Amino acid sequence: METSLSGIRVGMISLGCSKNLVDSEIMLGKLLEAGAVLTASPHQADILLINTCGFILPAKKESIDTILAAIHRRTTTSKKQKIVVSGCLYQRYGKELSALLPEVDLFLGLDDIPKIDLYVKQLIDTPPSSKEMPALNFSPRFIPDFEHPRLKLTPSHFGYLKIAEGCNHPCTFCIIPRIRGRYRSRTIQNVVAEAEAMIRRGTKEIILVSQDTTFYGRDLSNGQSSLLVDLLDSLETLEGDFWIRLLYTHPAHWNASLIEKFSTSKKIAKYIDIPIQHISNPVLERMQRKTEESYIRELLAEMRTKIKNAAIRTTLIVGFPGESEEDFQKLCSFVSSFKFDRLGVFPYSAEEGTKAEKMNGQVPEIVKKRRAKKIMELQKEIAKEKNKELVGKTLKVLVDYPGVARTEWDCPDVDALVHVPYHLPPGHFTEVKIVDFKEYDLIAR
């Protein structure tokens, strides 16, 4: 039976990562397919959908603050707006959140995403006194599908393609497996069909995301091996001039065939996103990262040798329980010597429900922040060195907005920018000459 939401104005506030953004796009696609219309002004919406993040404390605080601000705005304007909350925060806290925020009209879990149009229609038609929330499935099975309608929230020339959902890793600092469930892959055919549709709509950059892209397909092959290279082979056969960018690769699952694929492909961006988290063995062991220092060093060295002109990006955690000054100095030394092309660092966040939260040796907040600052000071100097080497070179860039572009070494909203002449058209590749730089960004003409 078709659901009619004709004329209902829907607003969206999407928080958190690119994977959550894909969920937001699917929910909007379902609502618009049912007749709703999108408004860019949350206060004008009949239905305000807030898709939350619940990963670490700052993200949880942002989600709660956003919900409270929406409730306050509705109260002060006397608007009969319905507030719908979805995403990781609710999936993680369930009844606790609904008890804390009774003003929210509807909470939706991950498995409710494909049925959001039905729940919103029911919300509109049901008197407030008899509202009933859908039962929350704490072992979600939802996987994005090519058949799901989707309203892209990114510029038309790039988009995120979620190839899998969930995670099987036992990292002691992370709550994601508890929130998102076990790893479950889409089929190669399903992913390729969506990529084809994106290219037909003018997409120039397809960004593959999941909790661990290098784990892709292991659940489809009884855990024997990843199917990521097979997926990349299929995507490379698609016609058109576009980049394929991979995010969230796990160092434990890289292999020779994947390195070979990166080194020979003409469509895969020479951009390796590989969060190592740390280099000290005692810390890696407590994190349960399934890697060790010697393996990480050898893998990164092999990448540098075999994948020419690649940018290697990593993410680090400092202040993990038990991280000694010696552990931290080893990390600093490694960052200084290896010279990552792109790097991000997070002070450890103790998350309830994780093994690390209960570990001895919790590091004071002031020490965590000082260590994170030190790492970024090192990286800033490295970035200046690398940018200085690019002055005078001609690079291919993708123009995002008037005056702003990116190289294949830069992911949207995460990495550096190239400042280009304003007349260059957004959504197109072009070549520019680098004439200067400022810290992380390049300046071109």
Swiss-Prot record:
Domain MTTase N-terminal positions: 8-125
Binding annotation for [4Fe-4S] cluster 1: C17, C53, C88
Co-factor remark: Binds 2 [4Fe-4S] clusters. One cluster is coordinated with 3 cysteines and an exchangeable S-adenosyl-L-methionine.
InterPro entries hit by this protein: Elp3/MiaA/NifB-like_rSAM, Methylthiotransferase, Methylthiotransferase_CS, Methylthiotransferase_N, Methylthiotransferase_N_sf, NA-bd_OB-fold, Ribosomal_uS12_MeSTrfase_RimO, rSAM
TRAM domain sequence ranges: 388-445
Gene Ontology terms for molecular function: 4 iron, 4 sulfur cluster binding; aspartic acid methylthiotransferase activity; metal ion binding; protein methylthiotransferase activity
Segments forming domain Radical SAM core: 153-385
Chief localisation class: cytoplasm
Subcellular location field: Cytoplasm
Binding locations of [4Fe-4S] cluster 2: C167, C171, C174
Keyword match rRNA-binding: no
Catalysed reactions listed for this entry: L-aspartate(89)-[ribosomal protein uS12]-hydrogen + (sulfur carrier)-SH + AH2 + 2 S-adenosyl-L-methionine = 3-methylsulfanyl-L-aspartate(89)-[ribosomal protein uS12]-hydrogen + (sulfur carrier)-H + 5'-deoxyadenosine + L-methionine + A + S-adenosyl-L-homocysteine + 2 H(+)
Disulfide feature: none
Enzyme class: transferase
Gene3D superfamilies in UniProt: Methylthiotransferase, N-terminal domain (3.40.50.12160), Nucleic acid-binding proteins (2.40.50.140), tm_1862 like domain (3.80.30.20)
Gene Ontology CC: cytosol
Entry annotated with the keyword Transport: no
SMART domains according to UniProt: Elp3
Any GO BP: tRNA modification
Function: Catalyzes the methylthiolation of an aspartic acid residue of ribosomal protein uS12.
HAMAP family assigned: MTTase_RimO
Family: Belongs to the methylthiotransferase family. RimO subfamily.
Record-given protein name: Ribosomal protein uS12 methylthiotransferase RimO
Organism whose genome encodes this protein: Methylacidiphilum infernorum (isolate V4)
